[in-house]
Amino acid sequence: MKRVAIFGHPVIHSRSPLVHGYWLKQHGIAGDYVRHDVAPDEAEAFFARFAEQGYAGGNVTIPHKEVAFNALAEADPVARALGVANTLWLEDGRLFGANTDAPGFLSNLDVTAPGWDANPRVALVLGAGGASRAVLYGFLQRGFDKVLLANRTLARAEALAAHFGPRVVPIGWDGVSASLKEAQVVANTTSLGMKGQPPLDLDLSVLADDAVVADVVYVPLETPLLKAAKARGLRTVDGLGMLLHQAVPGFARWFGVTPQVDAGLRDLIVADLAAKGQLGA
């Protein structure tokens, strides 16, 4: 029986076991997906000796995605471009890895807001932390002419923009309001609006009527930003879909079956969020 896990610190709140457990049951596969907390001071040694840990592969979450990437014998193009890996597997005892965050983000948009990238001109990304890398990469892959990157610390946005090239334009937080006027899609990658954090307060009235607003946060499922966007009549994309879609390639790699992100899976995770009081802000 294949055994895989989610590796990070902490991982107690990870819903990945629920996601993969759903697919294992759905397809009648004898497999196990567990949580494995790896202390930061043990991470480098853990991934360096991954073949000895008893796992066929797994997912990596914060704060270990970069450490895991550095331990890889081979990495897929997305992982190489971003310098982080979130999906691992073994081939002949060698550790291989991929980054499925960017494809997961795009798949979520494709399913939830079809045609969102039909005429890709300007996208606005809020935040220059770890989550923003996959989002920036995704927008560039879909051919956006310009991706505005806003961060409270401008130097951080500038450093990230330098990594991705001239189509990514760093702006200060005070430039967000003006940028909303030209953005076709807005993606929040900050923790603002997350449970226990202050809301992301933006004036969405200046957005075009066909604009799409996305959030990588899924606790709460409907962030204040998404709630405001819905009230404005805009199409919205929550962060739960990204979590579900990014999980597909790993499951296919480990178990040989490409699973579907269906209503039953989403309902399962939403029910878990509801049980923990995490649906609303």
Swiss-Prot record:
Q: Where does NADP(+) bind?
A: G127, A128, G129, G130, A131, N151, R152, T153, L154, A155, R156, V216, G239
Q: Which residues bind shikimate?
A: S14, R15, S16, T61, N86, D101, Y218
User: What are the UniProt keywords, alphabetically?
Assistant: Amino-acid biosynthesis, Aromatic amino acid biosynthesis, NADP, Oxidoreductase
Q: State the InterPro entries in the record.
A: Aminoacid_DH-like_N_sf, NAD(P)-bd_dom_sf, SDH_C, Shikimate_DH, Shikimate_DH-bd_N, Shikimate_DH_fam, Shikm_DH/Glu-tRNA_Rdtase
Which GO MF term does the entry hold, naming one?
shikimate 3-dehydrogenase (NADP+) activity
Give the reactions, separated by semicolons, that this protein catalyses.
Answer: shikimate + NADP(+) = 3-dehydroshikimate + NADPH + H(+)
- What pathway does the UniProt record associate with this protein? Metabolic intermediate biosynthesis; chorismate biosynthesis; chorismate from D-erythrose 4-phosphate and phosphoenolpyruvate: step 4/7
Tell me, in a sentence or two, what this protein's role is: Involved in the biosynthesis of the chorismate, which leads to the biosynthesis of aromatic amino acids. Catalyzes the reversible NADPH linked reduction of 3-dehydroshikimate (DHSA) to yield shikimate (SA).
Name recorded for this polypeptide = Shikimate dehydrogenase (NADP(+))
Q: Which organism does this sequence originate in?
A: Azorhizobium caulinodans (strain ATCC 43989 / DSM 5975 / JCM 20966 / LMG 6465 / NBRC 14845 / NCIMB 13405 / ORS 571)
